């Protein structure tokens, strides 16, 4: 079995984030753009040098703190790449640019295996029941999620996660490794705990990041958290505390092969049915008035169609987990982000101002609003694999029953990058210069 540790991982991070969250972040697009501009001077060589350092809660100064905005596309990948290349050459900003594409890789990889995430969700209750039925395993699980293990540093990460909605990238990897190989808990439950508490929690990067640490994404290649690599990246956070005081002396010294609980079918590639590029002028069925509404979800809060819609409405936040609600921090951030997106629809259109729903609505209220507004068609950004996608697809039939069609449109960036994410990151990563060229971003500062 091949084990990796920090020394082997200086060139990438398992979650493909590197652009991280913090509780001080305000869930508006304006604040995301301000943070993007503020971090740009540090997105070149300085980022490459210092991005691996975890200084502790409130001290994550060497990362951009953009991931919540990217997660919900309050800002999008293309404008982040364009901005960084206005300040740095592609070579100087390579590590920052690569992190953006790591996140895109995870999203695209899961798109090619559309059965994996739904099966993982179906297995979660079974996995939890099995843990709860074992006295030792249940005690270990309950202590882990309560931050009451005999590893004080692990407990500190739990506290930071629950209090801020954030963990540094390497802390996420160390946490996952300890959860799996030291506490011997199922990766599935660890991934679920993360996605409920991380403000930037994402079905693709979170689920697949945990599988990567467990040695299931790249078969047999596990990630081992060791006292040495933790101290290498978190020296200032740990201070003069000894390994014994931190519980680092209790860490597993080797990994082991985990059983693959997802079926072979779930792990196989599935046919892709991405929307065809949208026509320049919207079409409308005979007899219809052509009243089109833009539908927003938490997956993409900035996408707009070429033509001004007659109205705009947002779908209420989707539950991230089948086991428990998301944390209060996550819920408040997503609610406020949706409200900000609706408010922004009052501005920025070339001609008329659309009628905007006062708040995000559940399925029943959303359909009622569309009917009241006399809408014939709903247009929405393509939804990647995850809970929002299931809900949007579930709207097709009840919308059709009211004479309202549903059209999805895909971003050019996703259409460019995702087809190359079906295998390992290397196959996508080597095309980054090509992607930048296609996007007319190859010749930055």
Residue ranges and their predicted role:
Residues 75-78, 83, 91-279, 404:
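Active-site-proximal binding-pocket segments
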Residues 1-98, 102-108, 112-126, 159-163, ...:
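Trp/Phe/Arg-rich N-terminal binding region typifying the photolyase-homology
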């Amino acid at each position: 079995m091949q084990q990796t540790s920090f020394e082997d991982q200086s060139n990438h991070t398992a979650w493909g984030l590197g652009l991280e969250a913090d509780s001080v972040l305000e869930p508006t697009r304006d604040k995301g753009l301000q943070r993007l501009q503020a971090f740009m001077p540090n997105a070149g060589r300085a980022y490459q040098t210092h991005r691996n350092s975890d200084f502790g809660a409130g001290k994550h100064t060497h990362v951009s703190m953009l991931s919540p905005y990217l997660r919900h596309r309050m800002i999008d990948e293309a404008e982040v790449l364009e901005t960084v290349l206005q300040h740095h050459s592609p070579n100087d900003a390579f590590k920052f640019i690569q992190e953006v594409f790591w996140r895109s890789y995870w999203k695209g990889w899961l798109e090619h295996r559309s059965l994996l995430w739904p099966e993982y969700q179906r297995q979660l209750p079974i996995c939890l029941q099995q843990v709860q039925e074992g006295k030792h395993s249940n005690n270990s699980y309950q202590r882990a999620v309560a931050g009451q293990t005999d590893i004080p540093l692990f407990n500190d990460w739990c506290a930071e996660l629950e209090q801020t909605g954030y963990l540094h990238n390497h802390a996420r990897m160390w946490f996952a490794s300890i959860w799996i190989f030291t506490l011997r808990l199922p990766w599935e439950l660890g991934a679920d705990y993360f996605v409920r508490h991380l403000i930037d929690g994402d079905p693709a990067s979170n689920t697949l990041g945990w599988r990567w640490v467990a040695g299931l994404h790249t078969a047999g290649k596990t990630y081992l958290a060791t006292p040495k690599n933790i101290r290498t990246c978190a020296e200032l956070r740990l201070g003069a505390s000894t390994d014994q005081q931190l519980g680092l002396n209790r860490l597993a010294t080797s990994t082991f092969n985990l059983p693959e609980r997802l079926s072979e079918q779930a792990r196989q590639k599935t046919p892709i049915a991405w929307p065809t590029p949208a026509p320049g002028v919207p079409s409308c069925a005979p007899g219809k008035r052509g009243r089109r509404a833009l539908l927003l979800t938490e997956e993409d809060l900035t996408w707009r169609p070429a033509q001004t819609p007659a109205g705009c409405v947002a779908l209420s936040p989707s539950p991230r987990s089948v086991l428990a609600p998301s944390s209060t921090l996550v819920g408040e951030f997503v609610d406020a982000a949706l409200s900000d997106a609706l408010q922004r629809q009052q501005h920025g259109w070339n001609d008329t101002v659309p009628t905007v729903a006062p708040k995000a609505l559940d399925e029943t209220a959303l359909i009622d609003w569309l009917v009241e507004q006399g809408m014939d068609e709903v247009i929405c950004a393509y939804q990647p694999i995850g809970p929002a996608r299931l809900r949007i697809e579930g709207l097709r039939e009840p919308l059709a029953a009211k004479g309202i069609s549903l059209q999805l449109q895909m971003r050019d960036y996703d259409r460019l990058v995702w087809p190359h994410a079906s295998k390992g990151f290397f196959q996508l990563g080597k095309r980054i210069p090509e992607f930048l060229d296609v996007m007319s971003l190859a010749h930055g500062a």
